[in-house]
């Protein structure tokens, strides 16, 4: 008998319907990956006719079976281990680049955590999301940020953010804003079929309440939010599911949508104000060139909106003093390139200073 794939179905859901395992379905249909398309016919090999049945709730052991699609290769190196993860894709098996645990960082709080730059590049995926950017230079700003943060499949799971993912390193921990949960919710909303294929069949899900809840199934219980992200950080097969999702169009677009909403548009909002000599001045009247907007957006991603305004105020006041600007109206003529230079000089953290200075060489216009 055969089964025709319907919308939102996955190998996991189909296998449960017929009492088979995912591996059995893949073997009899010569499938190289878990990816399906609507209308695809699958051979259902049964010893005798069976009426399809749908269990009331998924069995956690089935999640453990599907997770075996992510093959973790470990290379002990004494005080740490090197790893790669291999997983099937429509174009054949993909193997990650090399990464390690016990990551050498003063910010490390989880020895099992890793740092992985990724392979799903901004440039090669640009056509998938260019239409989302209201201004052309938003693309270049996001590209600049990606150079400092990572690819669409990048991972950081060693620091206090618990588990961070994507080209802007969206954080999982609630204390860090849980922006990754927003990305996953958007991914599921935009393309539930792809979300199920990337996550649900592996026991990873989003409960879309007023405040979305991130969930991961384990043999004992279903974990939520910080505990769930900790499980992903400590389980490289689950980490592999995130890496694989970073190659999917809908996940890439979800990342860009949230980046635009939470960082770009908030950073350049006309409601953002600067206090100068006791007077509130719209920041859009001060830093209004491409370069000025790029600086504001990059700082918002790296330090948050409040943190960005603090360092911007100090740099703007310094440049105003150098230039003899004494009024709020005069700030409109401030040298924005000089603001970037002063802000970088004020920075004691080498990485943050270098990141800011890179803006001067990205081709952004500072012409007023």
Which stretches of residues belong to each language-model region?
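Short secondary-structure capping/turn micro-motifs that flank functional sites
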Residues: 31-33, 42
């Amino acid at each position: 008998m055969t089964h025709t794939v319907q919308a939102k179905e996955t190998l996991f859901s189909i296998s449960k319907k017929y009492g088979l395992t995912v591996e059995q379905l893949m073997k009899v249909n010569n499938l190289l990956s878990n990816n399906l398309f609507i209308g695809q016919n699958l051979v259902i090999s049964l010893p005798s006719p069976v009426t399809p049945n749908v269990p009331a709730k998924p069995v956690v052991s089935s999640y453990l079976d599907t997770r075996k699609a992510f093959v973790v290769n470990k290379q002990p190196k004494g005080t740490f281990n090197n790893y790669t993860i291999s997983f099937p894709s429509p174009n054949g098996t993909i193997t990650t680049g090399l990464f390690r645990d016990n990551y050498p960082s003063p910010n490390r709080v989880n020895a099992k955590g890793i740092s992985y730059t990724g392979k799903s590049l901004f440039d090669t995926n640009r056509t998938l999301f260019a239409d989302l950017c209201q201004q052309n230079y938003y693309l270049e700003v996001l590209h600049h940020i990606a150079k400092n943060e990572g690819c669409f499949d990048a991972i950081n799971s060693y620091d206090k953010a618990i588990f961070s993912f994507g080209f802007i390193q969206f954080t999982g921990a609630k204390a860090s804003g849980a922006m990754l949960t927003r990305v996953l919710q958007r991914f599921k909303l935009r393309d539930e079929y792809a979300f199920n294929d990337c996550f649900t069949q592996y026991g990873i899900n989003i409960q879309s309440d007023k405040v979305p809840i991130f969930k991961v199934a384990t043999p004992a219980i279903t974990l939520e939010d910080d505990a769930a992200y900790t499980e992903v950080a400590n389980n490289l097969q689950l980490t592999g599911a995130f890496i694989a999702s970073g190659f999917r169009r809908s996940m890439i677009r979800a990342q860009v949508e949230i980046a635009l909403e939470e960082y770009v548009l908030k950073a350049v909002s006309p409601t953002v104000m600067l206090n100068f000599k006791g007077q509130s001045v719209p920041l859009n009247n001060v830093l209004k060139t491409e370069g000025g907007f790029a600086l504001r957006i990059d700082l918002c991603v790296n330090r948050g909106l409040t943190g960005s305004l603090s360092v911007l105020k100090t740099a703007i006041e310094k440049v105003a003093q150098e230039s003899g600007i004494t009024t709020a109206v005069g700030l409109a003529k401030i040298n924005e390139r000089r603001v970037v230079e002063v802000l970088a000089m004020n920075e004691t953290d080498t990485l943050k200073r270098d990141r800011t200075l890179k803006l001067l060489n990205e081709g952004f216009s500072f012409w007023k």
